[in-house]
A protein has these predicted regions:
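ATP-binding Walker
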Residues: 14
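Short hydrophobic/aromatic beta-strand immediately N-terminal to the Walker A/P-loop
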Residues: 5-7, 152
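Walker A/P-loop
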Residues: 17
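Nucleotidyltransferase catalytic core that binds NTPs
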Residues: 142-221
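Glycine-rich phosphate-binding loop used to anchor ATP phosphates in small-molecule kinases
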Residues: 51-102
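Conserved substrate/cofactor phosphate-moiety recognition/catalytic segment
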Residues: 20-63
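P-loop (Walker A) phosphate-binding loop of NTP-binding proteins
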Residues: 11
Length: 221
């Protein structure tokens, strides 16, 4: 049963919603995307005074808790200008999108409290197409439990193919978690890819399973 809250905050125009939509494309219905504009629209409350902003905080916190109660990953997409408001979420993963320093909204610029680096887990200061996949695996780290029964899959994965996928499907029937262990092999005709190339390929192909699957690089066992 998953109970994970992810807060993605930053100025208007920083790319929060774009990031969230891409994560949803990857992780599917494991995730509930809680977008601040949609929540305001649902409440029909466009008051951006301090009182109005705090009402919005409470709505967003409640939506995140509802998603958790359903066993979903709560993906909170919110400017979240106040430090004290961010703390209310008690997020398992906090991502700061610092791609925009000042937005087009002067009232938001005045109240936005720029965070200290100790107040977030992950910073995106320039958009990269790999960001959604990277964030999926960051989420996965918060889901993974070392004490949970786990199957280990050991192999070269040069490259990942349908047979590997079929084996993974069988492994997931045996235990709630699977650790895919990539053997570090000497380069050659049978091993055309480095372990880091194999790892990158697996991270892209299996990002939808992050937290159910983990990827480890191990010696030539």
């Amino acid at each position: 049963f998953i109970e994970v809250k992810v807060l993605i905050f930053g100025q208007s125009g920083a790319g929060k919603t774009t990031l969230c939509k891409n994560i949803v494309k990857i992780m599917g219905d494991r995730v509930v995307h809680i977008n601040a504009d949609e929540v305001r629209k649902e409440a029909d409350d466009w008051d951006f005074s301090e009182q109005g902003r705090w009402r919005q905080y409470r709505r967003m916190v409640n939506k995140a808790e509802e998603a958790e109660d359903m066993g979903k990953i709560a993906l909170v997409d919110f400017i979240c200008p106040y430090k004290s408001g961010r703390e209310q979420f008690d997020a398992d993963l906090t991502i700061f999108m610092s791609t925009v320093v000042n937005s087009k909204y002067e009232d938001t610029n005045k109240v936005f409290e720029w965070p200290h680096w100790t107040e977030y887990d992950y910073d995106i200061n320039e958009w990269d197409d790999d960001d959604p996949v990277d964030v999926c695996w960051q989420i996965g780290k918060r889901i993974w439990e070392d004490e949970c029964p786990t199957v280990q899959m050991l192999g070269r994965r040069q490259p990942w193919h349908e047979g590997h996928q079929a084996l993974l499907d069988r492994c997931m029937e045996k235990a709630p978690q699977v650790d895919i262990m990539i053997r570090t092999m000497p380069w050659g005709d049978n091993n055309p890819f480095s372990v880091h190339e194999v790892e990158k390929n697996l991270r892209e192909k299996l990002a939808h399973l992050a937290g159910i699957v983990s990827i480890s690089i191990v010696p030539n066992i």
